[in-house]
UniProtKB/Swiss-Prot annotation:
One of its GO terms (molecular function) is catalytic activity. This is Uncharacterized HIT-like protein BU357. It holds the Pfam family HIT. Residues 6-114 form the HIT domain. SUPFAM superfamilies: HIT-like. PROSITE patterns: HIT_1, HIT_2. The lineage of its organism: Bacteria, Pseudomonadati, Pseudomonadota, Gammaproteobacteria, Enterobacterales. Signal peptide: none annotated. InterPro entries: Histidine_triad_CS, Histidine_triad_HIT, HIT-like, HIT-like_sf.
Amino acid sequence: MQDNSIFKNIIQRKIPANIVYQDKKITAFEDIKPKAPVHILIIPNFFISSSNDINKKNKWIMSHMFYIAVKIAKQKKINQEGYRIIINCNEYGGQEINYLHMHLLGGKKLKSFS
């Protein structure tokens, strides 16, 4: 799994990224290796390793991440045709960076899991 410092640097704007949304709680930016015409990563502005580390004190961040994902889907005009929201957890779940992040994908018909 990759080091999480890349996300920290994006949040602090120390490295270039196409940030589409940022507030005091989260940052959302375009994936540099998109899997769909719209591929946005949504991350907390504070470190959480994976969804396994969600607890009573920080569970509110998931709600905010989903809320902003829907807001961005509307902004990108993919909300009517449809989109996918994914959170990978740990190695077997496909998580590549040791930092909780949500993928928002859309802009084309996505393959089903069947």
